Amino acid sequence: MSCYVTHSRECNVVISGSETDTNRVTYYNIKVNVGEVAWTVRKRYKEFADLHAKLVNDHTVTKDILPGKKIIGNKEPDFIERRRIGLEIYLQTILSFLQKSMPEELFDFLEFDKYDVMLIVKKLATEFYQNGDVYLANENCFNFNVLQLYAISERLKLPCPDSENNKFNFSHVLDFCLRLKHLAIKGGQHYVNASNIVYNNLNFELSSFKSVIKLECFNIASNMIYNIKPLRNTVRAITIYNSKLKKPEDILLCDYVHKEWSSDMDSNMVWNKVKSVDFSWNEIETLASLTVLTPNIRTINVNGNLITTIEDLTALTNLSRLSLSNNNITEVFDLHTKLGNLVCLDLSSNKISDLTAFSKLFSIEMLDLGSNYVANIDQIKHLTKLHNMNYLVLSGNPVSTIVDYRTKMLGLLNKRTSDFCLDNERPTQKELDTVAIKHALRLAKEGKTLFDR
């Protein structure tokens, strides 16, 4: 992105063309270049005239260098072209004249505030000076875009004195970053406004954020973060959506060139305080690195990824909730040897048909198997020993279409109280009565009494 302070001699403008809208107002397309950064600004003649008046009054610009106003014939193509050339010469002249002391009015006219490091930081400083305490109250979230974080990162490298006006001081930005506890970052593969800047082509660092407890990122390029070290000491919850992560270490070790992990790795690389991660809607195929990089984690959400198998996560002794919805899991084996004392497991929207592997998950309380391929009602018998289970979802499976599905499920699972929830619905009294009657009939048929249950 632009940095006029360091590239003032590489700044130039041209008016590449003009457009007349349906209201017969003519706009001139100004292309601004600062080094390799370029953007386009659309202005009408009136805005040139307003700018010129300010420059004449406050910055000793010669009054007669702006092309004159014309009332009659000002929509003729020849006149518009002559005016385009004249306005281009005008802009180039004042830019050359004011290069070393670029006035705020000219920065605003050319929309530097949207693309320039110093002006973006200046805008942030003003915002935090006025409203920073409001944003920080109650640990509220603040959303930064990648452009703003790049600007802060670059400003840290510049030996520029603070502004004479206190509200513009960079210290307001640093103080806000230091105290912020809920940081959200938004990126994107698209251009920034009318420029050649792409959000996710900008690198940035997060060394100024030393109190963040919750980190959220949406559509970012994790490889563009070159310092995330302070967050490893404070963050408890991480959410990374739609960012094309291949592995958890893509973000957890984003500031390391070689993203290698092992059980004896440097403790400074480990996120010891993280209790939950949400890596939904990425391209993750394995969770293995979490066993080392987030050893104290309790909740993992990797919905909407590319996982095909459930790995051994027993090293995560505090793990209680695991969500693997919308992945590519077709078969599961020996889950009790891989998931420890899991309480909640979501495997909805996969391709599972055999439930044998679930038979020894004795700690499970909530199990979501909705929208899988379970077709045979006999598979439900593998869940009958899960006595702690009080929530089960099977809707969306072929088995849920059988006659008297709900009462058959409740009967097989021996769930005869309203505390149990099947497919997000508690049993009705009628369903409970039906299950009780069928149970009594079965006992009678077997020659048992109710006290022999």
Range-by-range predicted roles:
Residues 1-169, 438, 444-453:
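Phox homology (PX) phosphoinositide-binding domain
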Residues 45-48, 52, 80, 84, ...:
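Generic preference for well-ordered alpha-helical elements
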Residues 129-300:
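LRR N-terminal entry segment and analogous cap-like coil->beta motifs
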